[in-house]
Amino acid sequence: MTQTRQTEKQIRSFIAIPVPDEGIQSLQAVVQDFDADIGRHVRWVRLEGIHLTLKFMGNIPAGMVDRVLADLPTVTAKFSPFKVGIFGFGAFPNLHQPRVLWAGLDGDLATLASIQLAVDDAVGNLGLPKEQRYFSPHLTLGRVRREVTDGQLRKIGAVVSAAKLAVSPSWTASAVNLMRTELDLAGSRHYLVGSATIGGG
């Protein structure tokens, strides 16, 4: 009887645009204020782990990760670097029933949406599922714990809707990163697999 080939290692992975240090620093003060008011109801994302997700792929074979990385420069070479900034705060699905807290974005959102679509198409051409949801660019800050009351949800929504940045940073998006995620008891940790320059080069 022929022995079955060992299952290929699976890697939890996603494609994202990195957020520079000044963007992370501007969010830090807001998250600290959030934490003082509603922290016991929210699991916060590590600040160093905040990123602008273009495509979440989940657990995929290691060989597929290599193929995605090989194709990524072809996608990003079709675009030019563009401006993006942090603007406003909100929650999914809404501020009345907040479950995911986020920072919003402004800038050249048309180019951002085009890159996201091109990335999704490229990944789909490799045989991975294409995104079914509308692309809503954001930076995830935290996730509301399940054991909260309606009153606590209302308070969370009110705190988030009133938040403002002292400085609204903007930057030039010039790279798209392929990342892998490792899960531990403290949450998720993200590691760079490879990067592709927007505009080529």
Regions found by a protein language model. Give the residues of each.
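Histidine-dependent nucleotide/RNA phosphoesterase domain, centered on the 2H-phosphoesterase fold
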Residues: T2-G201
